[in-house]
Amino acid sequence: MSVLKQPLANPSRIRGIYRYLLQAKGQREKTKVLARSLSPDKLVENKPTPRPMFEACIKECIKCGLLIEEEKEEQTEIVINPDLSEEARKPGTGDELLPNTLADLFFTLDNEDEYDLGLVCAWYLSQDVYEPPGTWEAVEQKVAEQKVGELLKMSNNTLYGQMDDWMGYMGLLWGHALGGKRFIIPDPTLYLKRNLKYLFKQSGEKILLR
């Protein structure tokens, strides 16, 4: 299951977990302590499944390689993956770079779990920016018109909401309100602005726009 199909794993929750661990000693925390810090016991009293959102987010973070789980003294700990770049792990820059870090992890060639997210992002970015499908109803209609339903499997409003959340967080679309309703527009400008310095690393290199 990818973040596209796991509605409990959204950017704000994963960001909250990562921000906590960035400041934690050794960038690690016991799983039980982390769970109770982010989702206090009082809030989950008498719930059939105490912390489904926390568990879903941790699972997705481990699966994509953002975090790892380690056994220590008969307890599990959640740790920021030491294989991430130094800048991604720094307390001063890790939070700001998290959209890039997650995009890199999601779209790496060997991450088959997020293949469907990559397809949806590529499809939405290919839509006409002047007349984009900006609501779930419009997306549903456009998917049917273009006969890509089997490919994208965008079959309900929940999946659309996840697309909106994740593409927006990574800087691949933006949204605005009109008549009390949210509309989205495919636009990777924010993502490109964040990544130009990594794409063109040579000092003084000129970029020609045609």
Model regions and ranges:
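Donor-sugar nucleotide-binding helix/loop cap in glycosyltransferases
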Residues: 1-210
